[in-house]
Amino acid sequence: MIRHYRCIYRAVLLLALLALPGLKGVARAQTDGVPPPPFNGIAHVAIRVHDLGASVAFYQKLGFEQAFDLRRNDVPYESFIKINDNQFLELYPTSEHDPNVGFLHLCFEGVDLNAIHDNYVTRGLTPTPVRKAGAGNLLFTLAGPDQPSGPQNIEYTQYMPGSLHSNDAGKHLGPDRVADKLIAVALAMKDTAVARDFYINQLLFKPIAHDPMDLHMPGESGQEVEIVPAASLGTKARLTLESENLGRSARLLHKEGIAATKNGETLTITDPDGNILLLEHR
């Protein structure tokens, strides 16, 4: 059912977009000049949860182990859930200062972070300076289009030797993961047309044929973002993960008592805070 309504929405939106002025130059904007510095793919998605321990336990039932966490006074304030050596979920607990659960940010992994940063600056964007973050990797951020909670916080990282992520390579890769790759992230936007224009003409993402709001990131990862109306998702996260064997994934979920809805070639799971996980075989 989710796929059915998404297809209807995209078809209607495609007709509307084709009627807008200026879109004839979109394809040309993708090929003019030097290609943008490539991304390796999605590095992580950050989500705030109401009960960190319960969320960690839920994702462990999906086969995703906690690689490490960050603590203050021996109390965890960030948990890193491992999908594969290059992709993680970052879970943050609610607090008195930050009481709202849901999607926080999306982070892209760059091949050369300084090259991406400098490319953005030359095109008039205003990323923060590249710095070394707490886990030991390079990082910069950029403000994006308006989401339900405010301007999107877009993160960019480059894994560095000796970082917590690099030191965990080959570890915490559970044999019973229900999926092994994060391939798409939905971004709820207040104005989908403005957000689409920003990602295509500012960040140089490429529109996917017949899916006007699905956009491939620069590089050869094939991973994508999906621009969706804020009313359809609110502050929830919606992630699409790739499973090599959906039948096996369904059996693993059943074994752990995790409810899943099957719709064609998609399994839909909801986490304790209502965030949506789509398992697909592509």
Predicted regions and their residues:
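Bacterial N-terminal signal peptides that target proteins for export
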Residues: 2-13
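Short hydrophobic/aromatic beta-strand micro-patches
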Residues: 48, 107-109, 186-188, 240-244
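Core segments of cupin and vicinal oxygen chelate
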Residues: 37-39, 46-88, 122, 130, ...
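Conserved short beta-strand elements that form part of the metal-binding/catalytic scaffold
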Residues: 65-100, 149-162, 204-238, 243, ...
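Bacterial N-terminal signal peptides
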Residues: 11-24
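Vicinal oxygen chelate
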Residues: 30-35, 118-181, 187, 216, ...
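Eukaryotic phosphotyrosine signaling hubs
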Residues: 42-44, 101-105, 182, 234-239
